[in-house]
Amino acid sequence: MVKVCFIGISLRLEHAAIERLRSELDVLAQQEPEIEFWFHGFHSDFIKSMLEEVVSLKKRKPNQHIEIVDAVDPIELDAFKKKAQEMELSEEEQYDRQLRADHYIAHSQRIDRWMVNGCDYLITYTYENLLDTENTTIKLARAKNPNLKVISISVPSTAERIEELKAQLDDRKKFVVDSLLDGASYSSLGRTLGITSNRVHQIVGKATRLIYRQLKEELK
């Protein structure tokens, strides 16, 4: 039994990304006879899309051992059930078992990291030419688990569009983003600019939000 997790930015997936995902899921189902797909929360368009495609895979492979596992914070026990109702899933299409992550109660990001660090396959939708916590989580997971198989469904044309949008940032934001991507630390960059590292974080956050906001408009 292999464990599959997902991590991605909160964008509506392009048609090309969905097609890549379906293809990768079919290949995975051919390679692995027993698969668990792990989820935690349904707070992003990305995770909602992943659930829809896993449910579709289960329908296409009715005789294969494919399970949906819901890792839950006891405070949000019904998150999966509510989403399943929204998607009008039948009872057999909902999660196969539920795992209470009690030791991480009320720490959503820690549950996500705990899941990712223990998975065999990680399906990702991120862009390395932009700073976000998802890329950091992937790097940490790879360092912790050298055998982790990472499957990217990102789209090259979107990566190119991100470069175009970065070029439209004002000089300060662009300098900060490019410097951090090149390996500069927040503290050293703060000293260079004469500002606090916290202010550097704020600048990066604003730049990232501007780019994601534009991408969301274009991908509607």
Spans of model-derived segments:
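Helix-turn-helix DNA-binding elements, focusing on the entry/boundary residues of the two helices
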Residues: 186, 197
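Acidic/glycine-enriched connector segments
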Residues: 2-156
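Short amphipathic alpha helix immediately N-terminal
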Residues: 168-184
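Short, Lys/Arg-enriched C-terminal cap helix and immediately downstream tail that follows
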Residues: 208-220
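Short alpha-helical "recognition helix" segments of helix-turn-helix
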Residues: 188-193
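Short amphipathic alpha-helical boundary/capping segments
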Residues: 158-169
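Short glycine/proline-centered loop/turn elements that form peptide/ligand docking sites
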Residues: 152, 185, 207
